[in-house]
């Protein structure tokens, strides 16, 4: 316990407790020093609890009882679970005080300037730096702009404020991916400009990077949520699921473009936009016509959606630069009038488009009704044609009715016979097919059950992976927190001596364990030997008793020998019982000696003497108070 006491004393001194240099153990603490140490620790742990407590023990007994009760209540409020009261401080025992001080030392923050339980990590450190910077800026006095020096003008003006304006960036992906062409990798390595060179304004760099990172993170989160909710239920691999989804999006885009092109063509509004839509649809058809069966339509559509030819992009930019008018301050009014007229034309065109759209919807409804009527008429005509065909055949058979009836009867009989044969064949095939169907149904059900089980296992595995990832993140944060706490620990205390002493204690414990194991094994061997000897003695006495008892009826000396044998056996039993009782008494003596040592460490006698002295002091104080009351 000496090392533990030294660590506790060092912790108490770091809290502000004035522990004398000659005190090296908790056993040497008196009541005044205990009260001061506890109050100092409470003030560091929770200033609101220790602010109302005095670290100096008052001389009066009633005040001492009050401060002892207050300290006990404060320790219980902190979560101390063991028994604590005013007697713990006024009539202290070494184990109780050591346990209480260890509890308070564990509650102490690692650094008095910061809370030890603050989160660690890059984000937490960044937040702390931001808070410190804001506090520093808020602590600066405010001055009018004309009275500020150059540094304050830069730090307290709005010249550093910029709008959050993000722009698209072209960044290189992972070059280790095999799906990236070598030409693109070469472009990334040699010709791709840096991020700061891609943007016209330098303040947009941070906004663009933050926006790109946020979009990537949100895309990953949306994909995980979609894969959890829909992807796993589709029983497809992630690549197949993405391919199916992109094919559906391609079809929807193509359908929307076709509808827009058809609407522009019906409204007779030729323009550059309609021409672009037509070219786009033609490109879709060309891409999907020849290579659709080869499975490359998706790649071509993806290239169309996410990539552009550099030459085409350059031509479009040149054409846009030629078409866009160069604004001038003198032509602002003319441009405003032109914009107003164009807006009116756009409104009128939109109104015409809405009217044409309504008429188109009406025509579509009319076409649907007419198509339904035409289908009904076609169906009625087919039914009447069938009736006419049957009647015509019957009229042709009327001239030779008897022969035709005989032939018809023959055909009916043959058909009946053939039907019977077919029924027999069908029954035989039906039984076989029914068995096959039941077998296939059973196999399908087993496969579905197996698939469901695999699906459930996949979901459980995915959840376990997510839980493991969260646990890894939490442990990483905990590791960073512990690392920051370790770095913030005071470096003046050398841990080498404590570590060496801990290793010595561990080696001593191992030696004691070996000795205890050896004693236990020796005890077991001794007990086993005692049991063997006891059994041998009992068996020997039984055999001897039987042999002597047979001859004791006939011979007087043998009868005396039998009596001596019985007395010897009884005396041996009493001797063994006496030895066992002696061992029990010795064990009880050792237990009592240990209890005496424990009570001696609790300083029971000194505490009782102190209690008697306090009792006399209280009686004296009461007598003085009564005397003052009578005098008053």
UniProtKB/Swiss-Prot annotation:
Short name of any one Pfam family annotated for the protein: CCDC22_CC
GO MF term (any one): cullin family protein binding
UniProt entry keywords in alphabetical sequence: Coiled coil, Cytoplasm, Cytoskeleton, Endosome, Protein transport, Transport, Ubl conjugation pathway
Protein's cellular compartments: Endosome; Cytoplasm, Cytoskeleton, Microtubule organizing center, Centrosome
Transmembrane segments: none
Annotated Gene Ontology cellular component terms: centrosome; endosome
Main localization of the protein described in the UniProt heading: other
GO biological process: positive regulation of ubiquitin-dependent protein catabolic process; protein transport
Domain of life per record: Eukaryota
Coiled-coil regions listed: 243-269, 326-367, 400-540, 584-628
Function: May be involved in regulation of NF-kappa-B signaling. May be involved in copper-dependent atp7a trafficking between the trans-Golgi network and vesicles in the cell periphery.
Family: Belongs to the CCDC22 family.
Protein name per its UniProtKB record: Coiled-coil domain-containing protein 22
Species this protein is from: Xenopus laevis
Organism classification: Eukaryota, Metazoa, Chordata, Craniata, Vertebrata
């Amino acid at each position: 316990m000496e090392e533990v006491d030294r660590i506790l004393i060092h912790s108490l001194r770091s809290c502000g407790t004035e522990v004398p240099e000659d005190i090296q153990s908790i056993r040497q603490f008196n009541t005044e020093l205990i009260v001061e140490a506890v109050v100092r620790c409470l003030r560091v742990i929770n200033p609101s609890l220790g602010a109302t407590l005095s670290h100096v023990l008052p001389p009066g007994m009633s005040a001492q009882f009050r401060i002892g009760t207050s300290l006990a209540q404060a320790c219980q409020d902190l979560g101390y679970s063991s028994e604590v009261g005013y007697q713990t401080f006024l009539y202290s025992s070494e184990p109780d005080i050591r346990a209480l001080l260890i509890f308070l030392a564990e509650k102490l923050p690692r650094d008095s300037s910061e809370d030890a339980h603050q989160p660690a990590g890059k984000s937490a450190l960044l937040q702390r730096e931001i808070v410190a910077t804001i506090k520093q800026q808020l602590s600066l006095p405010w001055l009018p702009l004309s009275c500020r020096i150059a540094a304050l003008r830069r730090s307290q003006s709005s010249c550093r404020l910029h709008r959050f304006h993000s722009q698209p960036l072209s960044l290189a992906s992972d070059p280790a991916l095999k799906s990236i062409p070598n030409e693109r990798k070469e472009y990334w390595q040699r010709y791709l400009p840096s991020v700061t060179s891609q943007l016209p304004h330098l303040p947009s760099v941070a906004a663009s990077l933050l926006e790109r990172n946020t979009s990537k993170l949100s895309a990953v989160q949306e994909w995980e949520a979609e894969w959890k909710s829909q992807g796993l239920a589709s029983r497809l691999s992630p690549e197949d699921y993405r391919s199916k989804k992109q094919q559906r999006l391609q079809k929807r885009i193509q359908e929307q473009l076709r509808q827009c092109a058809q609407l522009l063509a019906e409204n007779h509004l030729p323009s550059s936009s309609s021409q672009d839509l037509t070219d786009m649809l033609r490109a879709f058809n060309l891409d999907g016509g020849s290579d659709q069966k080869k499975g490359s339509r998706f790649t071509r559509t993806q290239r169309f959606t996410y990539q552009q030819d550099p030459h085409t992009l350059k031509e479009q930019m040149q054409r846009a630069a030629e078409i866009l008018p160069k604004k001038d301050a003198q032509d602002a009014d003319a441009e405003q009038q032109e914009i107003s007229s164009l807006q009116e034309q756009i409104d009128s065109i939109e109104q015409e488009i809405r009217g044409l759209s309504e008429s188109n919807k009406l025509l579509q409804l009319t076409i649907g009704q007419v198509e339904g009527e035409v289908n009904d008429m076609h169906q009625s005509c087919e039914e009447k044609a069938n009736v006419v065909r049957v009647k015509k055949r019957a009229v042709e058979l009327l001239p030779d009715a008897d022969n035709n009836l005989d032939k018809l009867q023959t055909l009916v009989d043959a058909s009946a016979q053939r039907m019977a044969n077919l029924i027999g064949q069908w029954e035989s095939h039906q039984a076989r097919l029914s068995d096959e169907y039941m077998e296939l149904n059973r196999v399908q059900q087993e496969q579905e059950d197996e698939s469901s089980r695999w699906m459930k296992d996949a979901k459980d595995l995915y959840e376990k992976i997510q839980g493991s990832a969260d646990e890894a993140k939490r442990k990483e944060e905990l590791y960073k927190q512990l690392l920051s706490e370790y770095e913030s620990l005071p470096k003046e205390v050398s841990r080498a001596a404590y570590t060496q002493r801990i290793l010595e204690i561990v080696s001593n414990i191992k030696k004691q364990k070996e000795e205890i194991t050896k004693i236990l094994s020796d005890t077991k061997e001794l007990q086993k030997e005692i049991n063997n000897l006891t059994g041998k003695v009992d068996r020997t006495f039984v055999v001897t008793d039987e042999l002597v008892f047979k001859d004791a009826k006939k011979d007087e000396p043998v009868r005396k020998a039998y009596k001596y044998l019985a007395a010897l056996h009884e005396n041996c039993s009493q001797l063994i019982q006496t030895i066992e009782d002696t061992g029990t008494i010795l064990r009880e003596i050792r237990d009592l000696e240990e209890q005496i040592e424990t009570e001696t460490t609790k300083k029971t006698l000194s505490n009782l003497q102190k209690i008697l002295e306090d009792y006399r002091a209280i009686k004296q104080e009461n007598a003085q108070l009564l005397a003052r009351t009578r005098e008053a």
